[in-house]
């Protein structure tokens, strides 16, 4: 039997500070509308989503401040690196996300930008609430204690 050519999910950019700075309530996978040169640049892996966030305009959700650098081999048809990019979601998903943002003071932050099995660019979007300084310290203490516990158990045998 011939094996099926299966592609793995390729993570291109990850917002590693998001889990430290925000308490994440829910995540949603969203498509992202990119131009041709943006797709090629994202595949090169130079994308940054650390300072970006999602916001609504005219009932749609847009990714703001994500840095996708210009594609070097492109000529005059290149894209603007920090332009707002439309996120592709169903209407029910948009209403749910905007409701959480309006009612509960949540914010929408990207966690990962990746290509799925079909080669489509996807964004893992989180509904999150910002942590205060003492919350960050508390989560850091919990993480350190978990590491220390693991070390003690391994040393004990």
Curated annotation (Swiss-Prot):
The keyword RNA-binding applies. GO terms for biological process: trans-translation. InterPro entries: SmpB, SsrA-bd_prot, SsrA-bd_prot_CS. One of its GO terms (molecular function) is RNA binding. It comes from Nitrobacter hamburgensis (strain DSM 10229 / NCIMB 13809 / X14). Required for rescue of stalled ribosomes mediated by trans-translation. Binds to transfer-messenger RNA (tmRNA), required for stable association of tmRNA with ribosomes. tmRNA and SmpB together mimic tRNA shape, replacing the anticodon stem-loop with SmpB. tmRNA is encoded by the ssrA gene; the 2 termini fold to resemble tRNA(Ala) and it encodes a 'tag peptide', a short internal open reading frame. During trans-translation Ala-aminoacylated tmRNA acts like a tRNA, entering the A-site of stalled ribosomes, displacing the stalled mRNA. Residues 134-157 are annotated as: Disordered. This is SsrA-binding protein. The gene is smpB.
